[in-house]
Curated annotation (Swiss-Prot):
GO terms for biological process: symbiont-mediated suppression of host apoptosis; viral capsid assembly. Belongs to the herpesviridae TRX1 protein family. It comes from the Viruses. It comes from Varicella-zoster virus (strain Dumas). A motif (RIP homotypic interaction motif (RHIM)) lies at residues 24-40. This is Triplex capsid protein 1. Interacts with TRX2, MCP and capsid vertex component 2/CVC2. Self-assembles into homo-oligomeric amyloid fibrils. Interacts with host ZBP1; this interaction prevents host necroptosis and extrinsic apoptosis. Interacts with host RIPK3. It is found in: Virion; Host nucleus. InterPro entries: Herpes_1.
Length: 483
């Protein structure tokens, strides 16, 4: 039997609590008072590690001297604990349930979410070449691309000697020739930001995923649903651009970032204006459709990665949502794939976890990442100082310490062996990079629920993962993983 109190102030004192057990439960965090006012509290309320406090004598009445307990107040339910009483303010949505007469116990249940959830929405106008909101499911992941001029500038700087940065330039030209608005080098105006979706990039790199059936179904559905004769060409050329970016060390994660989760849209001809949930609970945002007022985050099944399952970790507890790029850097076999990963590990530990799972790719990139890079051919311009050879050769130029520290030290230095390091062809941080990840949200639930089911998409059944209770909002900072 339960009752809903209407008062906004509730006090439990010693006479009320003597000989009874009272538990305040809310999302597995509680205050429990037993015989003699023996109390335990958990960090959900007081911000401390759980400990036992004896407010009164445990076995001998209320006349003995109690131990002083400083007042404590929570941020969620405004509970004040003193040596004489427990005061609960704002009693809205709090239930008091007596369990039985033989075992007197009162349970006060706090609502799981007694705070206002704020959701931040974001809008973007874009062409529909890489993303059609009328085709995608509401709640799908939307990504935003930087301008192609930024990629070309980075390619001219970061491409190693021996590799051609014009490969990326040619790939971008071919890609935008198959789009609605062709782009030329040096053009800075026009629509600067393109948006795309997680399912579109997964369709581009369908051959990279281990779940071949789900990846092929997603690609076929994308081509069929978009209904454009050049859609297959766009997917192929977008994939070639991603491979060229890896070859030139202009990694895609530096130019593709998380935008939000699709909520609403307007579309006309080849332009669309989308509204996405950028921060806050996904289910808290409402759509203008009466049939689906609330939407749940969903992704293609081929891109989903349960890292905790692969690491044999516990499936319970809060989960972090990461966006992960995985790179293969072998010459002419460059690979890119994008995952949405779930893990209870934080940002620091997550990198070590995927480094363990991607050990083979990490080793291959370190061994083969410098293929095609120009090596040095100058015999007197070596990578390392030949100290042993110079010491064993009696004819090598030498000078005393006095000459080096004297007035004419510059003349003495010119007589010595001139060495300049040349590190071309050696592995670098960029050539060894195998992954990059960023935190984009959390699932703050004790029991995380995700469901895999078949969804109708473009006339085809596509395996889809639905994530419940996602709260978007991360650092939007990419962490790069290299050997």
């Amino acid at each position: 039997m339960g009752s809903q109190p209407t008062n906004s102030h509730f006090t439990l004192n010693e006479q009320t609590l003597c000989g009874t057990n009272i538990s305040l439960l809310g999302n597995n965090r509680f205050i429990q008072i037993g015989n003699g006012l023996h109390m335990t509290y958990a960090p959900g309320f007081f911000g401390n590690w759980s400990r036992d406090l004896t407010i009164g004598p445990r076995f001998g009445g209320l006349n003995k001297q109690p131990i002083h307990v400083p007042p404590k107040r929570t941020e969620t339910a405004s509970i004040q604990v003193t040596p004489r009483s427990i005061v609960i303010n704002r009693m809205n949505n709090i239930q008091i349930n007596p369990t039985s007469i033989g075992n007197p116990q009162v349970t006060i249940r706090l609502p799981l979410n007694n705070f206002k959830s704020t959701t931040q929405l974001i809008q973007q106008v874009s062409l529909t070449d890489f993303f059609r909101p009328d085709i995608e499911h509401a709640g799908s992941i939307v990504l935003i691309l930087r301008h192609p001029s930024d990629m070309i500038g980075e390619a001219n700087t970061l491409t190693q000697a021996g590799r051609d940065p014009d490969v990326l330039l040619e790939g971008l030209r071919n890609l935008f020739n198959a789009c609605t608005a062709p782009w030329t080098v040096g053009e800075g105006g026009g629509l600067r930001a393109y948006v795309t979706s997680l399912s579109f990039i997964a369709a581009c790199r369908a051959e990279e995923y281990t779940d071949k059936q789900a990846a092929d179904a997603n690609r076929t559905a994308i081509v069929s649903a978009y209904g454009c004769s050049r859609m297959e060409t766009r997917l192929i050329r977008f994939s070639e651009c991603l491979r060229a970016m890896v070859q030139c060390h202009v990694f895609p994660h530096r130019f593709i970032s998380f935008f939000g989760s699709l909520l609403e849209y307007t579309i006309q001809d080849n332009l669309c204006n989308i509204t996405a949930v950028a921060k806050g609970p996904q289910e808290a945002a409402r759509t203008d459709k009466t049939s689906t007022r609330r939407v749940t985050a969903n992704i293609p099944a081929c891109v989903f990665w349960d890292v905790d399952k692969d690491l044999h970790l516990s499936a319970d507890g809060l989960k972090h949502v990461f966006l992960v790029f995985v790179y293969t850097q072998r010459r002419q076999r460059e690979g890119v794939r994008l995952h949405l990963a779930l893990s209870q590990l934080n940002e620091q530990c997550f990198g070590r976890g995927i480094g363990f799972l991607l050990g083979r790719i990490r080793a291959e990139n370190a061994a083969w990442g410098t293929e095609g890079v120009a090596n040095t051919h100058q015999p007197y311009n070596t990578r390392a100082l030949p100290l042993v050879q110079l010491s064993n050769d009696p004819t090598s130029p030498r000078c005393s310490i006095g000459e080096i520290t004297g007035v004419n030290w510059n003349l003495a230095r010119q007589r010595l062996y001139q060495w300049t390091g040349d590190f071309r062809g050696l592995p670098t941080q960029l050539s060894c990079m195998y992954a990059a990840y960023t935190l984009i949200g959390t699932i703050p639930s004790e029991s995380v629920r995700y469901t895999r089911r078949m969804e109708r998409f473009g006339g085809y059944n596509v395996p889809t993962i639905w994530l419940e209770g996602v709260v978007w909002g991360g650092t939007n900072t990419w962490n790069e993983c290299y050997y």
